Structure formats: C-alpha cells, structure tokens
Amino acid sequence: MQNGTISLKVTPYVGTYDGQEHNALSEISVEPSDAKLEYSINGGEYSAEMPKIKDTSEFSVTVVASKEGYKTVSTTETIKVNRAEGKLTLSSYSGTLTYPNSTSFTINENTTNVSITSSNTNIATASLNGNTVTVNPGTTAGKAMITITTEETINYTSKTATYEATVNNGSINLRVTPYTGTYDGRQHNAVTVNVTPSDAKIEYSINGGTYSTTMPTVTNTSSFTVTVQASKAGYKTQSTTQTVNVNKANGNLSLSSYSGTITYPNSTSFTASGTGSISAWSSNTGVATVSVSGNTVTVKSVGAGSATITVKSASNTNYNEKTASYSVTVKYSTFTENSGVGYYADVDGNGTVDGIIFEDYKKRWICLMGRN
C-alpha cells in the first residue's frame, strides 16, 4: 500500500515597509487540510507558529506538510520587505531674505538623521533646531539652494528636499547735512553725518577727488562739494553729494577819530583799524588831500572849506569791504595885532587879490589864498 500525496501551495509575502506586521506567507493551501504544517526560518528549527515580518528584511521560510499515511512534502520560499521611500516635506520651499534678517521653515516629517547643506555659504547658510530650519543671509546677494537630506534607515530610503533662498543686500540709511554759514574764524566740519547701521564705514571725497576716512573741515570763505559714501559688508553702498558754503563776513572798520579841524597849512592824522587793507580819498582835494601809511591816515590842508575823507577796508578772502567817513574842516589863520603889517597882493596881475603880505619885526611872508 502506497502513502498518499499531500498538495502544498504557498505564496510568500513580498512588499514595502508600511509599519504593519504581516504573515511571512500571505497565502497557504494544503490538502488534506488537516495536514500538520511546520515552519523553519533560514534552515532553523521547525515550529508550528506562522513566522511574521514587519521591518525591512529578507529571509527564507521552509514549510513542511505531514500527515500519517501521506508522504511528507516541503517547499522553501523567500520573504522580503523592501524599504519604503523616505518621507520629507517642508513648510516652505523658497523665500527672500534681506541682510541681516533671517527666515525659517519647518520639516514636517522625519526629522531624525537630517543633514543640511548650502550651495553657496557666502549667500546663505542654514541650521536645524528640532524640526525648525533657520536660514541666515550671507554678505553676498544672490540665490543659494539649501538642501535637506534624510539618511537611509532600516525601513526608509534617503530623501532630499530643497529650499531656494534669495538674498538681497540690506539698505544703509545715510543722512548728510552740509555746513553753510558765514566766516567766523573757526574751523567747522564740512558735513554732519547720520547713518544706520551706525558701524558703516564712512568715506569722504572733496570735489570728486580721492576718498578718505578723514572728515573734511572748512574755515575760510569757500564753496566745494563733499561726496559722502557709506559701506558695510552685506549692505548696498550709499552715497550723496552736498555743497559746502562759507560766505564772506561783513567787513569791520573803525577810526580813532571821525572829524577834525585843521588850520592851514597844517596836517592831521588818525588811525584806521579794519579787516582788510586800508585806502582813503578826499571828496574835495581843493580843501584837503589824504595819504595812507599802514593804518595811519594823514589829512593835509590845501584850502579853506570842508571835505569828507572816505576810508575803505578792502574786501579780501573772508570779509566784504567796509567804508567809514572822516569830516575835515580847513580854516585860515586869524589876523591879530601880532601878525604885523598886511598888504594886499595881486600875484598874477589879473586885478584880483590873491593874498596878503605880512611884515613884522622878525620875518616877511605871504599868504596867497592857499599858498605860502
């Protein structure tokens, strides 16, 4: 009598990791149905318990079916769970930053074993804290790709996501006020500068010349341009050109005396103190003439009458001209009993008296209406 034949059909589990536990054999069919089934994993000991699989793995299962009066049969199958595709999602995939302000986004899944790189660290860098990625702008404007990568694990493949960071340079707020005033003999800064950020580098150029970090100053009357340039890494350089003006001051002029009387043929003098060189002239040279030596003004009588001596302090680099007046009266000498004997004289013979000739005990002299 021959043993019966057992029919054994088995379907192994082959799938992708899904976090669920599965029978190692997804289907098993045996005839007769009451045959005894035993399982061996990778050639190990047999057990009546169905093997399970959950995590990514690969192994063999041998199934043995037996029953009294039947020939024992077996089959070996390969069980396999493949890695699932890694999961990586970002709350944002692009953003614009203006130096020095940063921005951030979150990783919504799988924050373990994450690495972050930047395509250009001069433009932007990134760091991870928990599930938050902070993007910091560099000092160079442009675009940088922030790449987030999860490492391969037992059950998941590596996954990559990218964030495009656009970085703009920051803005410098530059406010410049030029000096405008009247000459006062003191030195002044050519401009007043206010800048944000306060540590920006400030440079100055006078009339388009070479830049210098030294603040230009102004004392004397002048007019010139100052270009102020503010710069800092990560910021757009800003500049502005302003005109500096120092105007002439009003001239000053004072006289030691402002009027006088001269008895012909005498002279008189006074001093003039001014902000420029001194000159003078007479309104009537038939009465008086004037000369200047340094700051001394000498008035010489010519004939009886009145004249105005105009004194001028000249315009110069820092002062406007200034004038002042000196009033002079010229008189002849008064005849007295000590003047001697006087005779009328017609010097040029035209019938008009030109003067009087005086004679005393000591000398003889002639006064000819302005001549002696």
Positions of PLM-derived features:
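An edge-strand/N-cap motif at the start of beta-rich repeat modules
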Residues: Y332-A345
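Acidic, glycine-anchored loop motifs typical of Ca2+
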Residues: G19, D346-I357, W365, N372
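Solvent-exposed beta-strand/loop surfaces, strongest in extracytoplasmic domains of secreted
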Residues: M1-S333
